[in-house]
Amino acid sequence: MPKQLNIQLLMTGNEVMSGDTIDTNSAHIAQVLGANGLTITRRVTVNDDINHLLSELSDMARTADIVIMNGGLGPTIDDLTAEVLARLADEPLVIHPEAEAQLLAWCERRGQRPNEANLKQRLLPRGAQIIPNARGSAPGID
């Protein structure tokens, strides 16, 4: 029998920690994984604090086969996922051409010009690959 993958899920956000936002994303991710014969072995929710995120993600990276991180990709100051990944990879944040193109296309579809906050979303750890996002302004990061 093949070894079961150790899949860990890191949910982020002060709004989730406070209960202002109900975490429906974990259930959706678990259902999609389950439909493919996979299960989550650990799920943790962390507030928008760089040190807490670094600590938890570093631990998961050491112990999991796969880490899925949800949240923290938006344009606000407390969206820290790209910065956390850059620090853990010891890589600088750089303008990612594909992320920038996706962001500009998202703004154009809405008849908006990107503002300074939006432009933050084109900054990814050097060497990162994007996961296209058909709904939002920020891509996922692989």
Where are these regions (language model features)?
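Glycine-rich phosphate/diphosphate-binding loop of Rossmann-like nucleotide-binding domains
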Residues: P2-R43, D48
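Short glycine-rich anion-binding loops that position phosphate/pyrophosphate groups of nucleotides
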Residues: N14-E15, G72-P75
